[in-house]
Every structure is written in structure tokens, then in C-alpha cells.
Design a protein with these regions (language model features):
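Active-site-adjacent loop/helix surface patches within enzyme catalytic domains
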Residues: 1-121
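Basic/polar, cationic surfaces and motifs that engage anionic cell-wall
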Residues: 85, 95-173
Length: 173
């Protein structure tokens, strides 16, 4: 189930099409705390989607608008700038050491497939916050390579080609 909670921290998307998905983690284990932060105008931060550890999804910004998730200096590829204006941002509730739950990843894969299908995003353009701000960010990998990038790219490829892919979310332990 997905609920929509409008964030004031957004702008109208310019005529640039969506070509990236940027995946983050929240650096917190609190879904409700992240919701409060994203709807606080003083925070000046948001994402299009938040995926909780139980698989719950909240949407804060319509995909037609710009969420403020990647930072103004973010570039992908290097030299192109403007990541927020051409991307969809997804935050996963988690920290550098918490890893991700099976329920959370299952919801992420379904969400990611829909976004890729709607916007025709190439699998190599499903990236992490660490990719667009490498000198400042480590998410969603955290302290080690815990994010399953091969699965994310397989889900994106399957969504583009309308083929099935068998994915396993992981453990909810």
C-alpha cells in the first residue's frame, strides 16, 4: 500500500525528462521521523518515495515534479549537473550498518520496475546517492557493499523488456 503525503520541498520539473533513479538510505531507522522531516519546510529536503523496513511506501512528490534529494552539486555523469531536475529519488529507511529487509527490497523492486517502465530509464541509470555525490555520500551501500545492485539492474532491465525476473528480497530477520 502506498500513501501520498505532500512535501512542500519540491519544485516544478523543467522540460527535461526523467532519465535517472537515485537510491538513498535515510541514515535513520525511523519511518515516521523521516516523514516528519520531509514535510518540514525548514528541512528543505524531500524524495519522491520512502520505503520502510516493513515494505510500506510513502510518496511525497509527484514524479512530474522535482524532489530535493540529491543535492545541488550532484552530477551524473560527471559534468552534467542538475541531477534533481532529471531524476526520481527513492529513500530506504536504514543506516550505514543496518542493511535492508526482504519486505523493504520487495517493495523497492516493484516500485523501481514501475518507475523504469513509465520513464524508460536505462538500467545503468539506476544509481546510488554515492554515485552522484561521490566525495560526500556512501548511500545506499553504507559501510560495505550491502545494496544488491545486480538485482536492481536486473529489475530495471526486465521492466524495460516486459520480461519476468526472479528476485529474492532477503531476510527480514
Amino acid at each position: 500500500m502506498m500513501r501520498f503525503i505532500q512535501s512542500p520541498n519540491r519544485t516544478t520539473r523543467p522540460d527535461r525528462h526523467v532519465s535517472l533513479v537515485v537510491i538513498h538510505y535515510t541514515a535513520s531507522l525511523s519511518f515516521s521521523g523521516t516523514v516528519s522531516w520531509f514535510v518540514n519546510p525548514a528541512a528543505q529536503v524531500s524524495a519522491h518515495y520512502l520505503v520502510g523496513r516493513d515494505g510500506e511506501i510513502a510518496q511525497f512528490v509527484d514524479e512530474a515534479d522535482v524532489a530535493w534529494h540529491a543535492g545541488r552539486a550532484a552530477e551524473w555523469p560527471v559534468g552534467t549537473g542538475g541531477v534533481n531536475s532529471r531524476s526520481i529519488g527513492i529513500e530506504l529507511v536504514g543506516t550505514a550498518t543496518s542493511g535492508f529487509t526482504g519486505s523493504q527490497l520487495g517493495s523497492l523492486w516493484a516500485l523501481l520496475a514501475g518507475i523504469v517502465r513509465r520513464h524508460r530509464i536505462a538500467p545503468e541509470n539506476v544509481v546510488g546517492h554515492k554515485d552522484v555525490l561521490p566525495a560526500q555520500k556512501i548511500d545506499p551501500d553504507g559501510l560495505g557493499s550491502q545494496f544488491p545492485w545486480p538485482v536492481a539492474r536486473a529489475v530495471a532491465q526486465a521492466a524495460l523488456t516486459d520480461t519476468a525476473v526472479e528476485v529474492h528480497g532477503g531476510s527480514d530477520a
